[in-house]
């Protein structure tokens, strides 16, 4: 897929009297698939881009950032499970409609499962994945480095 076909936009959500601005990416045509990145200080919707590019050949794909994460400024808000659940409900109620499927990474899967339990039949399919399994160092450093393997062995070695 030609990455110039990815459209970037902003969405707004209000929580406890604050308007929070977040980013989203959209590509493709067809049934809607929502991509939810992991909730991590280094995770953004950008980590979903390779998957978005593959799916966009058959689906309309939307990837969003979570509030307090991603590329937008982080407002001084306590990000509780209630806040993040409310955000996800806002996404399904106001940002995306008629969702064919959702891919949720890491802890985002927990919020998706909670939403599905509260709204049976609203989501056609769900795929729960953990793309940040490799840990934060390669993501922060822009790729693997030779010393990461030795560092991982040192961290995983039981202490005396």
Which stretches of residues belong to each language-model region?
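Short, hydrophobic alpha-helix immediately C-terminal to the catalytic nucleophile
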Residues: 49, 89, 113-117
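Conserved catalytic-core motifs of eukaryotic protein kinase domains, centered on the activation segment
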Residues: 45-47, 72-78, 137-140
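Structural signature of beta-strand start/N-cap positions in the alpha/beta core
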Residues: 32, 58-60, 99-101, 122-125
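Conserved HGGG/HGGXW glycine-rich cap/lid loop of the alpha/beta-hydrolase fold
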Residues: 16-71
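Active-site loop/oxyanion-hole signature of alpha/beta-hydrolase fold enzymes
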Residues: 63-103
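Gly/Ala-rich beta-loop-alpha elbow adjacent to hydrolase catalytic centers
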Residues: 103-112
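Flexible "cap/lid" loop of the alpha/beta hydrolase fold
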Residues: 113-118, 122-156
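N-terminal cap/lid segment of alpha/beta-hydrolase-fold proteins
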Residues: 1-21
């Amino acid at each position: 897929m030609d990455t110039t076909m990815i459209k970037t936009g902003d969405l707004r959500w209000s929580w406890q009297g604050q308007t929070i601005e977040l980013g989203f990416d959209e590509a493709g045509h067809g049934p809607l698939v929502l991509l939810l990145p992991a909730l991590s200080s280094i995770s953004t919707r950008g980590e979903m881009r390779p998957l978005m590019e593959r799916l966009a050949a058959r689906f309309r794909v939307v990837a969003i950032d979570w509030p307090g994460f991603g590329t937008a400024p982080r407002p001084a808000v306590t990000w509780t499970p209630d806040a993040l659940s409310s955000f996800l409900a806002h996404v399904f109620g106001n940002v995306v409609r008629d969702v064919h499927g959702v891919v949720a990474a890491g802890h985002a899967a927990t919020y998706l499962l909670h939403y599905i339990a509260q709204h049976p039949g609203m989501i056609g399919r769900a795929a729960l994945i953990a793309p940040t399994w490799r840990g934060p160092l390669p993501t922060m450093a822009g790729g693997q480095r030779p010393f990461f393997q030795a560092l991982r062995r040192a961290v995983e070695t039981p202490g005396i």
